[in-house]
Amino acid sequence: MIKEFKEFISRGNMMDLAVGVIIGAAFTAIVNSLVKDLINPLIGLFIGKIDLSNLKFTVGEATFKYGSFLNAVINFLIIALVVFFLIKLVNKMMPKKEVEEDDPTPTNEELYLRQIRDLLQEKTK
């Protein structure tokens, strides 16, 4: 069982996934800091409040903390933008796949289907 686990974990895809998760976690911390320490104060200058995470409004007894939601939206947008650019970069670096031209010679199945189609067309005329 340990041998199977060792084979499973040492596959290239599993190692790539592990590295991706670790880098993703570190990147999330960087984005959170960027939003909390740089972007929020910048936005706060324009709306008069420095800490967006404390923004809220109350209706009756319900309190809506929309500041934290704004932080989450900003984090998501930044991460999505970075992932988009990374995918574009990787796609440019990957060699283009040559499009295989279809074999012009029809298979037996295609020939039979064509005959059936032609017979049906003749029958309906």
From Swiss-Prot:
Disulfide bonds: none annotated. Keywords: Cell membrane, Ion channel, Ion transport, Membrane, Transmembrane, Transmembrane helix, Transport. PROSITE patterns: MSCL (PS01327). It comes from Lactobacillus gasseri (strain ATCC 33323 / DSM 20243 / BCRC 14619 / CIP 102991 / JCM 1131 / KCTC 3163 / NCIMB 11718 / NCTC 13722 / AM63). InterPro entries: Mechanosensitive_channel_CS, MS_channel, MSC/AndL, MscL_channel. Homopentamer. Its main location: membrane. Channel that opens in response to stretch forces in the membrane lipid bilayer. May participate in the regulation of osmotic pressure changes within the cell. Pfam families: MscL (PF01741). Gene3D superfamilies: Large-conductance mechanosensitive channel, MscL, domain 1 (1.10.1200.120). Belongs to the MscL family. GO terms for molecular function: mechanosensitive monoatomic ion channel activity. One of its GO terms (cellular component) is plasma membrane. It is found in: Cell membrane. This is Large-conductance mechanosensitive channel.
